């Protein structure tokens, strides 16, 4: 299932890993539909892809809203006639100790990190089942494999993504959907995740981590491309990437 001519939706595409992945896939011949909430950054990202000769379009989308994600998939199909891959990458990480009771931040993480992935699956699955082909890629985190102080809700959402994707893989095989799945468990990469952290001590620690040992988001983009490029009868079910310097 080579990347060239595949129609790929990338959420969280205005910056970081999503933007790097959209750029690489676009330059590799995919038809990329970028989605995020920041229209200015989406326009810039699409322009960069087109300058390199790639095909790309964008749609402002809040992945926490089911109807907007369904509209995103409909838009991709109207633009390019089909949908082959969705990369559920949008995420937030406003970490703080549970004792701070930042319930609005809890709700937002659950809505974007977990329900956003579920909304993406819901929107594409009928199309994938009908065409007997498709690929769901979702960003979890090493916080989906471990637990960390000050990251209780974030860890819970990323463990949830892990569970969703594992069940989707098994149900795809059991129901003969022929839908491939890939879950990314990512360590420290240079992204904007720390910008939403309101706890000063945690924000400073994460920013220092990213600044000192954070890896290039393009490395994740290369891994995503590799997973898509594999033959259709094979799923790269899990990819774990740490910065080499990360404990």
Q: Would you name each region that the model predicts?
A:
Residues 121, 157:
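Active-site helix of classical SDR
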Residues 39-40, 60-72, 103:
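The beta1-alpha1 cofactor-binding region of Rossmann-like NAD(H)/NADP(H)-dependent oxidoreductases
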Residues 141:
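Residue(s) in the substrate-gating loop at a strand-loop-helix junction
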Residues 179, 183-184, 203-247:
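C-terminal helical subdomain
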Residues 97-98, 105-110:
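Substrate-binding pocket helix/loop in short-chain dehydrogenase/reductase
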Residues 30-44:
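Conserved glycine-rich Rossmann-like NAD(P)H-binding loop of the short-chain dehydrogenase/reductase
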Residues 14-15:
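Conserved glycine-rich cofactor-binding loop
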């Amino acid at each position: 299932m080579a990347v060239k001519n595949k129609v790929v939706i990338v959420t969280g595409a205005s910056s970081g890993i999503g933007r790097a992945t959209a750029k690489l896939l676009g330059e590799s011949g995919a038809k990329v539909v970028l989605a995020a909430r920041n229209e200015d950054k989406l326009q810039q990202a699409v322009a960069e892809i087109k300058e390199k000769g790639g095909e790309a379009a964008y749609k402002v989308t809040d992945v926490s809203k089911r109807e907007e994600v369904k509209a995103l998939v409909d838009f991709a199909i109207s633009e390019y006639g089909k949908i082959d891959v969705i990369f559920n990458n949008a995420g937030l990480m406003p970490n703080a100790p549970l004792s701070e009771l930042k319930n609005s931040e809890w709700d937002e993480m659950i809505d974007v990190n977990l329900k956003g992935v579920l909304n993406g699956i819901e929107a594409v699955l009928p199309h994938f089942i009908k065409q007997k082909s498709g690929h769901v890629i979702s960003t979890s985190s090493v916080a989906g494999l471990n637990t960390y102080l000050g990251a209780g809700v974030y860890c819970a959402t990323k463990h949830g993504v892990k569970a969703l994707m594992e069940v989707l893989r098994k149900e795809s095989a059991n129901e003969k959907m022929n839908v491939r799945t890939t879950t990314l468990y990512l360590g420290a990469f240079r992204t904007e995740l720390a910008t939403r952290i309101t706890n000063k001590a945690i924000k400073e620690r994460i920013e220092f981590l990213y600044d000192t040992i954070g890896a290039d988001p393009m490395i994740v983009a290369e891994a995503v491309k590799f997973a898509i490029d594999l033959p259709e009868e094979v799923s790269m079910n899990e990819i774990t990437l740490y910065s080499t310097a990360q404990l």
